[in-house]
Amino acid sequence: MAATSTAAAASSIMGTRVVSDISSNSSRFTARFGFGTKKASPKKAKTVISDRPLWFPGAKSPEYLDGSLVGDYGFDPFGLGKPAEYLQFDLDSLDQNLAKNLYGEVIGTRTEAVDPKSTPFQPYSEVFGLQRFRECELIHGRWAMLATLGAITVEWLTGVTWQDAGKVELVDGSSYLGQPLPFSISTLIWIEVLVIGYIEFQRNAELDSEKRLYPGGKFFDPLGLASDPVKKAQLQLAEIKHARLAMVGFLGFAVQAAATGKGPLNNWATHLSDPLHTTIIDTFSSS
């Protein structure tokens, strides 16, 4: 009994010890340890939007797509943005008088709401979490908007389709809008790699996820269009909508180029010349 009392009064530097099932005729007791227990830091409250428009009428949005992200319409059919779910186990049996201690049983599940941390090194689940997918979506969408505009503009001004632009540069030499450039193709490639690489390194050096996507300032918002929070939210929504449309549109450009070998303007003119007989169905059925 004295040993039991001494154990119960032991220092709690290494953890918290809970003593139970102590009887006067036995020195057996069950101990639970909580090593390094810390108070959980308060989490940011999420803005939950109810009755918001969804990607499909009558669709049910997943719990993790609560509308807090701009342009969130509850679309994630493959569950790619679903946060990791962890099993909670009870503590293993710690009775030294037993021949075999039993493992702790599963007592529940726990899902962590991952908040982006200001660190260049993040766990796998955070790097490929919902916030990371949004960053990739927006960056790819911006590139797609530039590519879509570039493909249409170049074909309109020069008649060269976007898929043949590289061939023309290799044969006729590097040029811009018909004007020759004093650089070879290999030199231009190195310039592009170095410039874009430097820009991407600088962007990823920003640890604040909001500033990494929307840097603002005199270089990226010289007119101060995002100074008003309400207008900023509207512009962010318009941008993500146009970005998604541009990604789908350029995918259509690629499919058209593979099927017909023509550019988007040429395909559009061909379709307008005979709308009833020049469609995507006719194109793939005749190929």
Curated annotation (Swiss-Prot):
Binding residues for chlorophyll a 6: H271
Calcium is among the record's keywords: no
InterPro entries: Chloro_AB-bd_pln, Chloroa_b-bind
Membrane-traversing stretches: 143-163, 181-201, 245-265
Pfam families assigned: Chloroa_b-bind (PF00504)
GO MF annotation terms: chlorophyll binding; metal ion binding; mRNA binding
PTM statement from Swiss-Prot or TrEMBL: Photoregulated by reversible phosphorylation of its threonine residues.
Positions annotated to bind chlorophyll a 4: H242
Signal peptide as annotated in the record: none
Residues that coordinate or bind chlorophyll b 3: E200
Bilayer topology term: Multi-pass membrane protein
Residues that coordinate or bind chlorophyll b 4: R203
Primary localization class, coarse: plastid
Family: Belongs to the light-harvesting chlorophyll a/b-binding (LHC) protein family.
Other remarks on this protein: This protein is phosphorylated under normal plant growth conditions, whereas phosphorylation of maize CP29 was induced only by high light in the cold.
Official protein name in the record: Chlorophyll a-b binding protein CP29.2, chloroplastic
Gene: LHCB4.2
